[in-house]
């Protein structure tokens, strides 16, 4: 299965009538492996900072998580494995795998729990395949 198929079929799938706003699989180096059409343009340093938070949990807490034009307030995740952010009625979940990050961005009516489930399920699957 191609990386794009993982994004299209596993991340952008419908859950209880809702789906993510956008999603991507991004290498640890910040290179995009696959993304949905609406995934925001981002700076390499934004991905570098996300990777740094995986290595040093809490690194993003004082400044927030920036991805493209959006700043997310970092909320409780799983240190070294999952970063979660909130912005208004939406948010972001980033799951680290062996070589990549699975990123999902959502807005209402999708819930944070639904976003977490979609992103973390694919991330866990990829981790178990390695």
UniProtKB/Swiss-Prot annotation:
Motif window: Involved in PIP2 interaction: 81-97
GO terms for cellular component: cell cortex; cytoskeleton
Top-level taxonomic group: Eukaryota
GO biological process: nuclear migration; regulation of actin cytoskeleton organization
Disulfide bonds: 13-115
Gene3D superfamilies per the UniProt record, alphabetical: Dynein light chain 2a, cytoplasmic
Protein family: Belongs to the profilin family.
Identification of the protein by name: Profilin-12
Naturally occurring in which organism (per UniProt): Zea mays
